[in-house]
A protein has these predicted regions:
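Residue-level preference for beta-strand/loop junctions
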Residues: 2, 50-52
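Feature marks short, surface-exposed loop/turn motifs that line or immediately flank catalytic pockets
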Residues: 12, 44, 63-64
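Flexible, low-complexity linkers/stalks enriched in Thr/Pro that connect modular domains
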Residues: 41, 96-103
C-alpha cells in the first residue's frame, strides 16, 4: 500500500474557497488501476503565520500505481487548472509519499 499526500497552506479566510475547488473538480481517480481512496483533510489554523493546513490524501495499492497516475492523461486533466487561484495558497503544495510497512 502507498499513501500519497500533498500538504497545502491556505491563507486564512480562503478555506471555504479551497474546499469548493476540490468539491467542484472532476476527478478520474476511481478509473485508475490501484486507486483505493481519496480524502481532503483540514488541519489546524496557524493564526500567527496566517494559514490553515490542508492535505489531499490518496491511498494506492502500490507506489507503481501512484506513479502511473502521475504520468497519465487523467492526471494532466485533473491538474490543468492548478495555477488558478494563486492568491489563496501560501506557497506550493508539499508532497509526501509513504509505503506501508505495518498494517491491519
Amino acid at each position: 500500500m502507498f499513501v500519497a499526500m500533498n500538504r497545502f497552506r491556505i491563507a486564512v479566510g480562503h478555506e471555504e474557497a479551497f474546499e469548493n475547488i476540490w468539491k467542484g473538480r472532476e476527478s478520474s481517480l476511481a478509473e485508475m488501476p490501484g486507486f483505493r481512496t481519496f480524502h481532503l483533510l483540514r488541519g489546524d489554523t496557524n493564526a500567527e503565520e496566517g494559514y490553515t493546513l490542508f492535505a489531499s490524501h490518496t491511498v494506492w495499492a502500490s507506489k507503481d500505481d501512484f506513479t502511473a497516475w502521475t504520468q497519465s492523461e487523467n492526471f494532466r486533466q485533473a491538474h490543468k487548472n492548478a495555477g488558478d487561484n494563486r492568491g489563496i495558497y501560501l506557497g506550493p503544495p508539499k508532497f509526501e509519499g509513504f509505503t506501508a510497512v505495518v498494517g491491519a
